[in-house]
Amino acid sequence: MLSPKKTKFRKQHRGRMKGSASKGNTIAFGDYALQATEPVWLTSRQIEATRRTITRYVRRGGKLWIRVFPDKPVTARPAETRMGSGKGAPEYWVAVIKPGHILFEITGVPQKTAQQAMKLASYKLPIKTKFIVRNTIES
C-alpha cells in the first residue's frame, strides 16, 4: 500500500476541503480517466483496491497511472482509552481529494473496456465519480 517514505512531521491537523481542485483536474498521461465529483479522504487501502480492480480487468492491455498519493497521516487513539494524554499515533494515510480531481488514468485499451474498468473501480471508492475522455484535436 502507498505511504510516504519520510515526512517532515509525524502528525498533521485535519484541515478543511473547501472548493474544487485547481491542480490535477485535467488528463495528463492517458486517454481515459476517472474523476472525483465529491470531496473525500481516500485511504491507501481504497486506492490499492481500485488499482487492483482496474489492472485485473484490463489484463496485460493498457497502461495505468495513479494520479493521487496518500500523504496525510490520520491518527487514532486506542480503544477504551481515557481522554487526554496527547494526540494518538498515526494509524493510516489518506489522500485529500477535492471535486474535479483526476484519480486514475488509462490508455492502450478500447473506450468500452476502459469505461467498464473505471465503472468497476468506482464501486471500490466511497464517492461518486465520472468517466472522462481526453479531448483530441486532430489537425
Curated annotation (Swiss-Prot):
As for subcellular location, the record says: Plastid, Chloroplast
Q: Which UniProt keywords apply?
A: Chloroplast, Plastid, Ribonucleoprotein, Ribosomal protein
Where are the stretches annotated Disordered?
1-23
- CDD domains the UniProt entry points to: Ribosomal_L16_L10e
- Please name the GO terms of the biological process aspect recorded for this protein, alphabetically: mitochondrial translation
Task: Provide ranges: composition bias, Basic residues.
Answer: 1-17
HAMAP family attached here? Ribosomal_uL16
Q: Which family does it belong to?
A: Belongs to the universal ribosomal protein uL16 family.
Name of the protein: Large ribosomal subunit protein uL16c
- Species name: Porphyra purpurea (Red seaweed)
Quick one: which gene encodes this? rpl16
